[in-house]
Each structure stands twice: as C-alpha cells, then as structure tokens.
From Swiss-Prot:
GN (gene name): hisB
GO molecular function: imidazoleglycerol-phosphate dehydratase activity
Keywords: Amino-acid biosynthesis, Cytoplasm, Histidine biosynthesis, Lyase
Protein name: Imidazoleglycerol-phosphate dehydratase
Catalytic activity: D-erythro-1-(imidazol-4-yl)glycerol 3-phosphate = 3-(imidazol-4-yl)-2-oxopropyl phosphate + H2O
Primary location class: cytoplasm
InterPro entries: IGPD_sf, ImidazoleglycerolP_deHydtase, ImidazoleglycerP_deHydtase_CS, Ribosomal_Su5_D2-typ_SF
Organism of this sequence: Pseudomonas fluorescens (strain SBW25)
One example of a Gene Ontology biological process annotation: L-histidine biosynthetic process
GO CC aspect terms: cytoplasm
Amino acid sequence: MAERKASVERDTLETQIKASINLDGTGKARFDIGVPFLEHMLDQIARHGLIDLDIVSKGDLHIDDHHTVEDVGITLGQAFAKAIGDKKGIRRYGHAYVPLDEALSRVVIDFSGRPGLQMHVPYTRATVGGFDVDLFQEFFQGFVNHALVSLHIDNLRGTNTHHQIETVFKAFGRALRMAVELDDRMAGQMPSTKGVL
C-alpha cells in the first residue's frame, strides 16, 4: 500500500504555514501556531482520527487570530486532498457522535469532491480564553473548500462553550478516521457509481 502522507506549504502576506499529515498514523501531533486553543482542538483531530499532524505557522497574530485560523484550515484541507489521492478504496463517508458531560455533537463527512459546509453550533459564549469561537466557522470553511468535502456539523446540546467545541472537534476527528479508512472489499475501486469523485 502506498503511503498516504502529504506536506503542504502556504505562503501569503498574512501567514506562512507548513502542514504535514499521515492518514495512517497513530495520532501523533506537533503544533507551533501561536493560538493555543486552536492547537488544543487540532490535537483532538489527531488523537481521535489517528492521523499524524505537524503544523507550523507564523501569522499576523498582532492583528488577530482570523487569518491564521482560516489559513490553517485551508492548508490542512489541501494536505488531506493531496494525501488521499484518487480516493480509490476509501470508505468515503464518515460520521460520529461525541459527548462531553452535558454537550453532544454530531459530525458527518463525505469526500465527494464537492465542497459544502453546514455548521450549526449555538455557542453559549463568544470567546473561550480570549479565543473568538466564530473563527471555527472560518477554519472549517477553509478546510471544506480545499479538501473538497461535504461537511455537516451539529452541536445537539451543550451549555459549556469549551465542551461544545471540543465535542465538535473530537467528532470531526472520528468522522475523518472512518471516511479515509481503506475498505478491503473496495480495494482499488472508486466509492461512487459515477466512477469518479
């Protein structure tokens, strides 16, 4: 089996980002982004998706976190698209429900080749530790646009904003793990009746 790894660099006037992933990893993660809460959430993707992630970013954090958070999503999406290749043999679809105390979230993903995001998270606070939680919409939109996936994110309940977000990212990691997993019964076949994704 060919290694499903990729490294991508993004260099703009706002951010310089290097991202490396291994879809068949063990959940190892290393981050140097400068946005601790984002790094904490990315660690959930790695751990629960069993995807090795290494992301280094230098951005205009003196302005705010927006460009860095969005561009990390873009770069991660590009890395996924590159690592997954032609998509032959993958399960394609993934879903997960994850609870954390009072919070419960559901994430469903389709590596369809058609970008689309439906995200419904009724945050109970605007910030967590100074981090603007609205920026996660930008992160996921960037990921979706460049990984070329359809992604549905729903926080079904929760009163603690940190818990709401953490359940989303844990469910996202688990849904990714399911979707990118190779299915022995689909070996070498495209998971679509069209023959292409």
